[in-house]
Amino acid sequence: MSRVTIAIALCLVHTGCEAVSGGAVELSWKLRPASSDLPDKFVDCASGLDGTNPVTRVRLFWDVDGQQGTASWRCDDNHGVTGFDLPEGSALLSIAPECAEGPASTSTYTAPPAEKRRVISGDTVSLGAVEMILRVSYCGQQPCICE
């Protein structure tokens, strides 16, 4: 091999790769109404229904062997990927909707139970598509999402 070839190969190795020290999480989400009498079986982040306000963000929570963290994305993105921020280890991963004023009241939605996954440095854990069920009807009789 010539010196030029070796030099080019070394440049590519040093500039083309970035060291990572943790794992990442990828997920997508859909919002469903708690009441099945609505004609549409999915709702937008801003449902436009009386007594509700928009879900502005979706937050991912993690606890990896006692080390906790979060990441959030705009609800309308319908998809999110963290950086390689999670430490290696056994992770509990959960999600929750957020309103403009802060976290949504837990009485106004149902999120999937926390999932246990193994985080490996340099790898991405996929939660796949998750659904959150939101209270968006009968808001005069019960609390609704982000009211």
Language-model features and meaning:
Residues 63-80:
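Short, acidic Ser/Thr/Gly-rich low-complexity loop/linker segments typical of extracellular
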Residues 74-77, 98-142:
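Structured interaction patches on ligand/partner-binding surfaces of diverse proteins
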Residues 1-6:
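Bacterial N-terminal signal peptides that target proteins for export
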Residues 28-51:
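Short amphipathic, basic-aromatic surface patches that mediate peripheral association
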